[in-house]
Amino acid sequence: MHKIWMRLAAALAVLFALSATPAMAQATRTWVSGVGDDVNPCSRTAPCKTFAGAISKTAAGGEINCLDPAGFGTVTITKAISIYCNGPSNGGILAAGTTGVVVNAGATDTIVLSGLDVDGVNTGLNGVNFLAGGSLVIIDCQFRNFSQNGIKFTPSGNAGLHVE
């Protein structure tokens, strides 16, 4: 009888071990490239294609870097994150008929946007629409051809804005 219980316990342990799903850790630094693919892990050697693809694989407080000067699509930011596309790798966002970057993050989250070229193609609404977060830092970014605002800063609580 004791052997039956031991075998049953061992079988249950194996069953639970096999059914457990592994935790997917997010990277603190990810990359995007015009020749990337959003199914990639967004590493330097296997970059993502869009900011939206990279942001889901980047840990809160992490950063996304551009490997080349391509268009990386619009993005909604819901956590502390930095997007750096300075130098010859300026990242582009084409936001025809929509907003380029929507920020709706936590009350203490800092968001940094650096080196972005955001184009509304005359029908885009806003380059950046900041709804919530702790602070927004914009460095060396261009916002052009929007029907409403380049930067719309209407936080739901206390927040800071720094533009260089």
List each model region and its residues.
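Acidic Gly/Asp/Thr-rich repetitive segments characteristic of extracellular carbohydrate-active
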Residues: 34-73
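Sec/Tat signal peptide C-region and signal peptidase I cleavage site
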Residues: 21-25
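Right-handed parallel beta-helix/beta-spiral solenoid domain characteristic of secreted/periplasmic
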Residues: 74, 80-129, 139-142
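Solenoidal tandem-repeat scaffolds enriched in leucines and small polar residues
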Residues: 149-164
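N-terminal secretory signal peptides that target proteins for export/translocation
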Residues: 1-5
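Small-residue (G/S/T/A) turn/hinge positions that recur once per unit in extracellular repeat modules
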Residues: 107-109, 134, 157-159
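Bacterial N-terminal signal peptides
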Residues: 9-20
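Cleaved targeting-peptide boundary
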Residues: 26-30
